[in-house]
Design a protein with these regions (language model features):
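Extended catalytic cores of very large enzyme megasubunits
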Residues: 1-566
């Protein structure tokens, strides 16, 4: 601990008076009762936290390596990092201490840009941006410019290209367009050229509606073989916006009209069913495009956004965020923003009855959003405007499958459906209350206030992939996804690590089978335990991998929790 910080903490100790938790009218914790494992952390605002070095034991070697390689500042420890983030986005000492406790006990984890940049001058704490290109050269150039700035400051980007005319349509008197693909290819090159701080290269996704005349070429855009290599964008992600009308056409095996975005004129027709099969084939073979059922999304947007005439046209890099973009009724261009963090469902039994927990995290996210609005540069003006107007945040989850395995509940069971609903109903109730409480305390977001709604956040929850933070949280299962394998080698930017399912390990220990030989057979069997004859069928069902599960169960579980994602 440096000399200046030590002096500041000594001063804080000498001047300290026990705080009263205004929410519960109880005396606050004794921050300055220290032992061999604890010491004080204080930030530049004077927010003081008692940190516990023994909580490093909550982290796995893989989690520590991930934090060390990508998130720790100079001379910063794991607990220092957690305290830095908690103190920077806390309302006061008591809030900061609770936030630190939540993070260090792995109850929740801020999104990676918050971990990396919160409380520093390295970059911004926002991880998610959505925008759209207008059908003009200025609009395209403006999107490129904005995306360069967003990627350079750590953002993942989702851009809508459906406003642009397709290849061969008229420009002016005699000109013809070259279509959207060449412009997307330039975006591909620009994004790859920009580094997101020290964490990763720039990354972006492009979205197109299913009735755009270039949809067939767009679907194949990331295939390395076939077609013109000059009309490929191999590094971008891409998604297709599927309408209800298209799905009806698929069901009835009808022709599907591909229309000009400029005037709605039909450019060509294709078999809806063949186009759907082509889309699904590309998805099976390459993992993309993403599929967004856009009419379903727009039926579920907040009522105040419907009244304002706003619609969702696109999603983000990871396709879990759906927010309005483009020109609003005030003539301003919106680049949607959502700041993310995720609750750890694996620890659900520890925090489910804590009345402060979800509210504290929502306050944390509100403070993160305010930090972005106050400190983002002028190049982010459209994003700052959108964030100010709608104040959308995305409180997500991770560890759902790990929670099932911890409780020995097969994912393909009635009990998994019961817990799924119960968990997300509980979270929804608490985030809704927090949004209303914060609206009373700090004011409703302008979008909601204009129509008389008392909501601090237009959107409150979102299920992010949590690829990195699930590793930090002890290797819990990512997002709401099932575990891919019970034993495997995980390759990341931090290196390669052998990962073994801890709950399966506990079961094998009880059976006297926790040996390298057993784990070797699991690894060679693609992470499955189906071949282990000493396990019961129910035990095998609990530890089914993602590839062994009936995918209809995943669809059913998603459908059950969707009403509670807002």
């Amino acid at each position: 601990m440096n000399k200046v910080l030590s002096q500041a903490i000594k001063k804080a100790v000498s001047e300290f008076k026990p705080q009263v938790d205004q929410k519960n009218k109880t005396k606050g914790p004794d921050l300055f009762s220290l032992n061999n494992n604890t010491e004080l952390f204080q930030n530049s605002r004077g927010i003081t936290i008692k940190i516990d070095r023994s909580r490093d034991e909550n982290l796995t070697d893989f989690g520590k390596a991930t934090l060390s390689d990508r998130y720790l500042g100079e001379n910063e420890s794991f607990q220092d990092l957690f305290a830095r983030v908690a103190s920077h986005y806390a309302d006061d000492n008591l809030h900061a201490q609770r936030l630190y406790n939540y993070i260090s006990n792995l109850w929740f984890m801020p999104a990676t840009p918050v971990l990396s940049n919160g409380g520093t001058t390295r970059g911004l704490p926002i991880s998610c941006f959505l925008n759209e290109a207008s059908d003009s050269l200025n609009g395209i150039l403006g999107l490129w410019s904005e995306n360069v700035w967003l990627a350079a400051r750590g953002g993942g980007i989702g851009s809508y290209w459906g406003n642009l005319r397709s290849i061969g349509e008229k420009i002016g008197r005699v000109g013809k367009t070259s279509g959207i693909i060449p412009f997307i290819k330039v975006m591909d090159s620009l994004t790859m050229a920009i580094s997101q701080g020290s964490l990763r290269r720039g990354s972006a996704a492009c979205y197109l509606p299913i009735d755009h005349p270039e949809i067939e070429e767009f679907i194949e855009m990331r295939r390395p073989t076939g077609g013109d290599p000059n009309r490929k964008a191999l590094n971008l992600h891409h998604g297709v916006l599927v309408s209800d009308a298209f799905m009806r056409a698929v069901e009835l095996d009808e022709q599907w009209a591909l229309k000009s975005p400029k005037n709605g004129a039909v450019q060509s027709t294709v078999s809806a069913r063949n186009l759907w099969i082509r889309l699904l084939t590309a998805r099976v073979e390459t993992g993309e495009p993403y599929i967004i059922f856009i009419d379903t999304v727009n039926r579920q947007i907040p009522q105040h956004h419907k009244l304002a005439g706003l619609t969702v046209k696109t999603s983000n890099l990871c396709s879990e965020i759906t927010l309005p973009t483009g020109i609003d009724k005030e003539g301003r261009d919106r680049t949607a923003v959502c700041c993310l963090s995720s609750l750890n469902i694996e620890k659900y039994d520890e925090w489910k009855d804590d009345e402060n927990f979800v509210d504290d995290v929502m306050r944390f996210l509100d403070n993160v959003l305010t930090d972005f609005i106050n400190n983002a540069p002028e190049e982010f003006s459209d994003a700052k405007y959108s964030a100010t107007k709608e104040r959308s945040v995305g409180l997500g989850v991770m560890g759902l499958h790990s929670y099932y395995q911890k409780k020995m509940i097969p994912l393909e069971s009635v009990m998994s459906k019961v817990w799924n609903k119960k968990i997300f109903e509980n979270i929804q109730k608490k985030v809704d209350k927090s949004s209303k409480d914060l609206a009373e305390e700090r004011g409703a977001c302008p979008d909601a206030a204009e129509y008389g709604f008392k909501e601090r956040f237009s959107n409150k929850t979102a299920i992010a992939p949590t690829a990195s933070i699930s590793i930090i949280c002890g290797g819990t299962s990512p997002g709401v996804e099932p575990i891919a394998a019970n034993s495997y080698t995980h390759k990341t930017l931090s290196g390669s690590f052998n990962v073994r399912n801890k709950y399966l390990r506990q079961l094998l220990e009880k059976q006297g089978k926790d040996t390298d030989e057993t784990w070797s057979t699991i690894t060679t069997n693609q992470g499955s335990v189906s071949h282990l004859d000493f396990l019961t069928q129910e035990e095998k069902d609990v530890f089914k991998t993602a590839f062994e599960l009936d995918q209809r169960w995943l669809v059913d579980l998603s459908a059950d929790r969707t009403p509670h994602i807002s």
